[in-house]
Amino acid sequence: ILNGRWENVDESMSEASRSYQKQITGQEGKAWVQNGVKFDGIKDGILIDAKGKYSQFINKNTGKFYDWFTGKKGLLDEANRQIKAANGTKIQWYFAEQDTLEVVQDLFIDQGIVEIEFIYQAPK
């Protein structure tokens, strides 16, 4: 059951990430908060998150994130928090970069996270 609400947020991010988030969610400076957990938005009853530029953290030789990239844990933690808060509601993560989508998808599968749908949508 979706019982969340839109809240104003002041997030630190690049202008490109902010623009992409607005492209995906239709909102600017707002987040959907469901059971205390932030999502970038909600559309047609689906909880959504927008992921911008991560390809600089991907080792082109291995096709995985660099070992020094600490954002891996943050992505996993965010996914687990969102899955719990969604309580069975569908979740979609939109990616601005196809290579990032593939790396995150592999990371999640390795960790047994399969509840999030991955969608590639190029920035406008």
Ranges and model annotations:
Residues I1-K124:
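Catalytic toxin/effector domains delivered as secreted proteins or via bacterial secretion systems
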